[in-house]
C-alpha cells in the first residue's frame, strides 16, 4: 500500500502528539495545536459550504497572520489549491493573478479590502470575497463575508476527497518584473520533500519558536508554514517587518529561529542601539563585551544564493557566532 506524501500529515501528527502545545501566536491571539487544527477543519467545511471543491483555486492577499497560516492546511485538505499573492503588488497585478489562476474565492486582509472591491468587476469567475479582518458595513452590504463569523458557524467535519501526491497544492506567482507574473505549480509531494530536506539540514524540536520575518506568500514561506508544524514548534506571526517589533518578539516570545532575506538582516543589524537594547535591561547591556564571541550564541545559516560576504560579516559581528551554508 502506498501512502501519498503530503505536508497535511504534519498537522495531523502535531495534533496527536502536541495537542496542548502552543502552535500559533498572532498579537494577542494564542492557539494550541488542537485549537489551530480545529479552526483549519472548520474553514475547510465552510469553504465546501461555499461551493469550493477539489481543484478549485482560493486566492489570499494578506500579511503574516494566523488566518493566512490556516489557509496552508484548510484549503489543500479539501483538494483545493491555494494561491498566496504578494500583497506588495498593485491592483492590476492582483487582477491578473486572480484571473489567470481562476480563483473562485478571494480572502483579503483589512489593508486590501478596498482594492479588491475595486477590481471585483474584472473578475467574473470569483464567486465569494472574504474579509479576514476589518469588514466594514458598506463592504458587508456589497456581499463580503467575515472570516471569523463564517468560521464560527461552520462545523468541524468536512468531506475529505482522495488526494494524490502529484495533486496541486499551491500556485505561487512571480512578481512579474520582466513580464506578467508567472505561476509556479507546487504539488503535495513537492512541498513534503522540501520540508523533509529542510528538517535534515536544520535541527528543530517542539521547543523551537519561529518568528515569521519571511512572507508566507514567498515560496510558501520557504515551506516553513509546514516545517515548524512538522517539528511541533510555535509559529509567531509578524505582520510587518520592523526592527523594534522583531527585537521585542525575540525577547518576549523566546524566539529561537527566523528566516530573512539579506535586506531584512541588514535592517536588523542597522537597528538603532536603543532598539537592540530591548533584548536586555540597560544595566545588563552596559556590561556586555564588544567581542562577538561573548555575545548571544546565534547560528546564522545561508541557503540557496547566499548573501554578500559583507552582509554575513555584519550579521556575525552584531549577533555573534559564525554562519554556515545549510543547503543549496
Task: Name what the model sees in each region.
Residues 10, 49-50, 77-152:
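Structural core segment of the AMP-binding/adenylate-forming
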Residues 19, 131, 152-173, 180, ...:
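Conserved pre-ATP/AMP-binding loop-to-beta segment of ANL
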Residues 56-57, 63-83, 87-91, 99-105, ...:
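A short helix-loop-beta submotif of the ANL/AMP-binding
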